[in-house]
Amino acid sequence: MNPIVKTFPYGQHTVTIETGVMARQATAAVMVSMDDTAVLVTVVGKKEAVEGRDFFPLTVNYQERTYAAGRIPGGFFKREGRPSEGETLTARLIDRPIRPLFPEGFLNEVQVVATVMSVNPAVSPDIVAMIGTSAALAISGIPFNGPIGAARVGYINDQYILNPSVVELQESKLDLVVAGTAAAVLMVESEAAILPEEVMLGAVVYGHDQLQTVIKAVNEFAAEVGTKPWNWVAPAANVTLKAKIAELAVAAIGEAYRITEKAVRYDAISALKQRIVAEIVAADETQDAGEVADLFHELESDVVRGRILRGEPRIDGRDPQMIRALSVGTGVLPRVHGSALFTRGETQALVACTLGTERDAQTIDEITGERTDRFMLHYNFPPYCVGETGMMGSPKRREIGHGRLARRGVSAVIPSQAEFPYVVRVVSEITESNGSSSMASVCGTSLALMDAGVPIKASVAGIAMGLVKEGDSFVVLSDILGDEDHLGDMDFKVAGTSEGVTALQMDIKIEGITKEIMQIALKQARDARLHILTVMDKAIGVARDDISDFAPRIHTIKINPEKIKDVIGKGGSVIRALTEETGTTIELEDDGTVKIAAVSGEAAQEAIRRIQALTADVEIGRIYEGKVTRLAEFGAFVNILPGKDGLVHISQITDERVKDVSDYLKVGDMVRTKVLEVDRQGRIRLSIKEAKRDELPAAESVAESAPAQEAVVEQVPMTE
């Protein structure tokens, strides 16, 4: 073994890249470490492509091993299972910047596997895995127009921070990951606390400048390894065949792309393609039908892009900055806590919001330990939304990624637990799709949250921008269609409020995206966002004053922390009986905060009354009405409060001389007693005869020592 090692400083960290020790049968393998966070990245490429394949089969797998953090997995099998949501998102983060760098026509299967071997809780493994992927591809010999660099950018005290630690990220107003080559930005993924566009753009530029350190180090590392590149030659373009197809189809393609309705347009294009393929193959049987179809698709791209660059109307007749027709509705599902239907052109999201209690929070088992999440956003993309049939089941990578992007878009406006003590789950059902369904989910989520009475800080809207660029000519498109996304050069998604950006995602398919282009895109995105927010605010501009009648009301009271054990009872018997008998959900916190959740107000008040009784102190001189629980020769025991029995001595039953207690009292009798004394051991002395002498009524109200009800999340409905 002859290991080759490259070490370089990167921000506040030191990065080490090593090869030649592990996974030597892979096409390439590197171990990359950053301050004790270590990731093994392997690349395997097939030398030959499968005949007839018309797509590039790239697979990226990212896996976290719990031993990396000194932990044993939970569950029955005690081993890692299917990828978590976090692992899936990191795999997508690695995939997106490298996929466009494989050359056109390269169809050999390639698999990238990144395995976290050691983790420092302060250093996230995702950037390490991205650096490792770049280095492994650079030394693999596989055709690849890299290397890439990757950087995380934070924003603290108006300063950009390179690769902030996990602790610093909690303070940061920005979490932005940028990846790119020496010449261009390829991918951006970010979440922000409502920051201005210029701050977001500055972060992208700053990150791209800093990641040049990685690219330089990887180039030096690859030169030292010295792997020979594969002897692969891109297939020659069939210019003659493309000209023949153009002669037969260009005019018809142009007409088809004037059809504004997606389904009708697709049918026309499909029929035209089948006719052209059949004609050419019939005229020359040596022609490959797949090649004809591919060249036909290239012509589609040429027609659509050329029309946009010439200033002609887009596919659906809009100009570059025009937004499709909007339709907004709230409260569309009668028994759902909050709902909205957001439609933009042929893209539609039905969004539902559900309110729950703390026990509904999601427990997430991460490599560094467990955490709970009180806000969930799930995105579903069924096949019917694009007029297709397909398998239904667990969410795919795309659905997980789009759901996380939508969540990033609204996270900045979600109220804290102190402001709104509910756990919130939002589900976005995409019922129609023709571009930017994730941004429709952002808009629908904002509306559904307000419809549910969640006091979000501001309305949030999202928009997807596109780009068509040839040479120095370019056009930035607002609110792109699915075809414009597919045939264009950039997918640039921006979510935010009227004050600033909350999320930015960018995927670029070409090099040469300048700062000027990004500035124009952000400016158009802001204009579009403000237009959409105006329409949304007409439907519902602030959160409803009342939550749904079908949602649980959360009532909060405070008790003496020393009394928590009285509410719980032995083995949880008391609190279990309370919840079962009142039909409520009760949660206790160490500081004595008690949260009672119930759909019925009467049930909640009954639970509160019983908790107050359980935790109230016995007051000397106060009269209580209680039940006789036990008789003894020397007196009777009376239960005056839950869990609190006192003794009525035989001499305190009546003024007369009592020979036998049972002559005056029986078990189960309700009697009025006065508290005479509570001794140091907590024993309570009661008197029936003193209570009779006292003219005060029995204690029907809560004792002064009982806890006060602090807050009730119960509001008055707002009329529309």
From Swiss-Prot:
Places the protein is found: Cytoplasm
**Cofactor(s) needed by this chain:** Mg(2+)
Q: Where is the KH domain?
A: 552-615
Chain segments carrying region Disordered: 697-720
EC annotation? Answer: 2.7.7.8
All copies of the S1 motif domain together span: 621-689
Assembly, in brief, is: Component of the RNA degradosome, which is a multiprotein complex involved in RNA processing and mRNA degradation.
* HAMAP family per the UniProt record, alphabetical: PNPase
- By what name is this protein known? Polyribonucleotide nucleotidyltransferase
Native source organism of the sequence: Tolumonas auensis (strain DSM 9187 / NBRC 110442 / TA 4)
What's the source species' lineage?
Bacteria, Pseudomonadati, Pseudomonadota, Gammaproteobacteria, Aeromonadales
